[in-house]
Amino acid sequence: MKNKIYIAIICAFSIVFAVSSGFLIKHYCDSAKQAEMYDNLIEVVETEPEETTELMNYSEEKTFIPEYQELYLQNNDMVGWIKIEDTKINYPVMQSKDNPNFYLKHGFDKAYTDYGCPYVQENCDMELPSDNIIIYGHHMNDGSMFAGLMKFKDKSFWEKHKTVSFDTLTDRQTYEVIAVFKTVVYTDSPDSFKYYQFVNAETAEDFTAYVEKCKKLSLYETGITAEYGDKLLTLSTCEYSRTNGRLVVVAKLINE
């Protein structure tokens, strides 16, 4: 009887080990695949386009930035490119209005992946644009996707990295960070700030109230604010010190 119990325990542990190993191998393979794919996309973005490249019209007034045109032709859900120095944040940004959270679990190539791809909230208008463009990205343990936003918790990092590059398909843009804060979502707790509900201000007072709330929650004072008429960029990722925690970086457009 003892031998049977012993054998059963060994078998159980073996199954658990095999399943765990399978998950680890799958995760490693996924990580390697995503890293290779985005490295290839970065190479396209950082390679000087050929002078003979014929630029497509994005609208009546604007043409594509050459390197982004090539990527757009691969996936027309692409709406921009985000980069933050000294982090791994150097990615295409997507938007799927018909399937809002598609890129939560799909990469640039539209294949399923736990890494997803940074994406814009579905009710944000990239054309007008909206007063606030909200971008989501995963906080991955290997430091990829939006895990690099965690560095902004340290004021000394912000002091050396006060700007974020977020280009649209037609315009190169720089944003200046005005606030970095932590909050919780999916709860009616007093600690919850539903920053994702602010896309367009109906009045100047609405805009000011949102900015003041962000500044009040900020982990440190940046000395920078925004006024009605400014365009905002809000970057959001998971923050694991609390259940349903989020780290949010808010910036304002300073050039276009």
Q: For the regions a protein language model found, what residue spans apply to each?
A:
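Solvent-exposed, non-transmembrane regions of membrane-associated and secreted proteins
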Residues: 17-256
